[in-house]
Every structure is written in structure tokens, then in C-alpha cells.
């Protein structure tokens, strides 16, 4: 017939003639449970809508017949978005904030060898002899914090055109402009993905308050020619931060959450993806590539 009740309730009807589902009643809503496994690509002419936990943030996603999936962007007029993108110059382009690049900059030539090498990115490398150089990109306007009215969603895509064990990494929120001039795990009020000089490239998720460190291995390791997509999320007033990291080349994902030793509430931090050659003195011992940094807040 032209219309019928679904689930025995007239508030949800299916109009077979017009192929329309109607949610009636008062204060209607549709709740979609987040997937554990990515759905298959739909057939030609169709689009799959679903939800997924991305770094602790439940996100609406769509997938087309090509198999490519992407999240739906929140309204730009609500909350705040802070974005860095590569432009072919060391500064790149920050939106809604200001920032700075550091290290010997070169524009990349994309090649199709892997998802990382095909990615448009800026690159920064160390010069010869000088130790503990800061390489990469960060915003310089301390804007982000945990606690009441704080919280943030952070995402970044980066990797290494050259990685040598003994280097450092901090894809993170931090208060110190020299967060990788020493081991990032020693810097107060820092949260994110780090490598200390003695870690031999092992990437950890780290939180540190004013004094105490909490450091958890992701199981993924920095390798020359490999890229990573990282995310972390803590809601306003939240006491737990969730995280995820994707090995872009292998497709391997690690995730977790922690409530231990978060940065001191109300301490303003900056966002960045930074690396250092630490004690490595040969030129280009470390060459960091960064494609994008994205931070979203509710205020």
C-alpha cells in the first residue's frame, strides 16, 4: 500500500510509493551505533552513512562506491577550528591562529610509492653538527587546555622522509616552545604522541601534568618513508583523553585512553608536530614531513 507502520508504531512510517521514511511524533531523533569494522563500499549510485569513534570523538562518516570514506565536517560557525596546511613555504598557512616552522625546509615531490610519499606535505630537516634542533610546525598562540570550558579534538597527518633512531618526536599539545630540544616526556603539561631519544623510534602516547609522566606504547615505530594519522579527544570538563594512531602505509591502527596525569586544568597549550635530531649530528638525520594539523574546540 502507499504507507505502513514500521516496528508497530505509526510515528515511524514507510511511504512505499515515494520511497520515504518519516519519523513523526515529538522530538524525534535517529541514533546510529558506531561501527567496529569499516563497512564495505556500496554499489554504484549509493552512499553509506555510518558513525565511528575517531580518536575518542564519535563522528558521522560516509563511504562511496570507490571505498574512500571521510567524516562529515562540523558547522564552521559553531565552535572553533584551527587548521595548518602546507603551501610550499616553511610557514605554511594557519587558519584562526598563527604559527611558525623550524628546520631546513624543502618542498616535497610527491611520488606514488606509498600513501605517505603520495601525500602533499612540507618537510624540515636538521643541519650538520648542531644537536637538539627543532624541526616542524606549531602554532604560537596558546589556546587549548583541559578542564571546564576547555577540551579539544586534535588530528595530524605526518611522517618521516628520513628517520634515524636517536631522534625525537612530539605530535602533541605542549607549553614549551622547545618541547623536543630535550625528551618530550620530561616537559610539564604535555599530551600527545612522542618519541624520546632512547626509544629507538617507538611511538608512545604520553600525558604529563606538572610533575608526573604517564607513557603508553602504541606499538608503532617511526620508519623512513612511513606516514601516520593521529587523533586525540577530550571533551569540555572531561577527565579522560582518548587517542588513536594509524600507520598509513600498513593500515594498522592502535588506540586507547587515559585519565592519568593530564595537563594541569586551565594551563593553555599550543599544538604542533615537531621532531628533533637530538644528539645525531649528520645532516638530515631526521627529515619530518607534515601534511596537516587540525584542532577543533567547542568554544
Predicted regions and their residues:
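Beta-strand acidic-aromatic groove motif in beta-rich domains, primarily in extracellular
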Residues: 164-175, 241
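Low-complexity, Ser/Thr/Pro/Gly-rich disordered linker/stalk regions
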Residues: 73-163, 237-238, 297-299
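Short tryptophan-centered beta-strand motifs in secreted/extracellular beta-sheet-rich domains
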Residues: 154-156, 225-236, 241-245
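Extracellular polysaccharide-targeting segments
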Residues: 254, 285-299
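Flexible glycan-contacting loops in extracellular carbohydrate-active proteins
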Residues: 257-289
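Extracellular repetitive beta-rich solenoid segments
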Residues: 1-80, 87-90, 100-102, 130, ...
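Short hydrophobic/aromatic patches on beta-strands that form ligand-binding or substrate-lining surfaces
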Residues: 156-158, 171-173, 293
Amino acid at each position: 500500500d502507499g504507507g505502513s507502520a514500521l516496528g508497530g508504531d505509526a510515528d515511524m512510517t514507510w511511504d512505499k510509493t515515494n520511497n520515504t521514511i518519516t519519523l513523526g511524533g515529538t522530538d524525534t531523533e535517529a541514533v546510529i551505533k558506531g561501527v567496529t569494522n569499516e563497512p564495505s563500499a556500496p554499489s554504484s549510485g549509493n552512499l553509506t552513512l555510518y558513525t565511528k569513534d575517531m580518536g575518542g570523538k564519535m563522528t558521522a562518516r560516509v563511504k562511496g562506491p570507490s571505498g574512500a570514506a571521510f567524516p562529515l565536517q562540523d558547522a564552521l560557525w559553531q565552535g572553533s577550528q584551527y587548521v595548518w596546511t602546507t603551501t610550499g613555504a616553511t610557514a605554511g598557512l594557519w587558519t584562526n591562529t598563527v604559527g611558525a616552522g623550524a628546520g631546513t625546509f624543502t618542498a616535497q615531490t610527491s611520488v606514488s610509492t606509498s600513501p605517505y610519499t603520495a601525500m602533499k606535505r612540507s618537510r624540515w630537516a636538521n643541519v650538520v653538527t648542531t644537536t637538539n634542533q627543532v624541526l616542524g610546525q606549531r602554532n604560537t598562540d596558546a589556546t587549548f587546555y583541559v578542564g571546564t570550558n576547555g577540551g579539544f579534538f586534535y588530528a595530524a597527518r605526518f611522517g618521516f622522509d628520513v628517520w634515524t633512531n636517536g631522534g625525537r618526536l612530539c605530535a602533541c599539545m605542549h607549553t614549551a616552545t622547545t618541547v623536543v630540544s630535550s625528551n618530550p616526556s620530561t616537559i610539564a603539561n604535555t599530551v600527545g604522541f612522542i618519541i624520546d631519544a632512547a626509544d629507538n623510534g617507538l611511538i608512545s602516547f604520553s600525558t604529563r601534568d606538572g610533575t608526573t609522566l604517564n607513557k603508553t606504547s602504541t606499538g608503532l615505530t617511526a620508519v623512513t618513508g612511513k606516514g601516520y594519522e593521529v587523533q586525540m579527544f577530550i571533551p569540555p570538563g572531561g577527565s579522560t583523553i582518548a587517542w588513536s594512531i594509524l600507520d598509513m602505509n600498513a593500515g594498522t591502527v592502535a588506540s586507547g585512553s587515559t585519565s592519568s596525569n593530564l595537563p594541569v586544568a586551565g594551563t593553555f597549550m599550543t599544538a604542533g608536530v615537531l621532531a628533533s635530531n637530538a644528539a645525531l649530528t649528520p645532516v638530515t638525520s631526521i627529515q619530518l614531513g607534515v601534511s596537516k594539523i587540525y584542532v577543533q574546540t567547542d568554544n
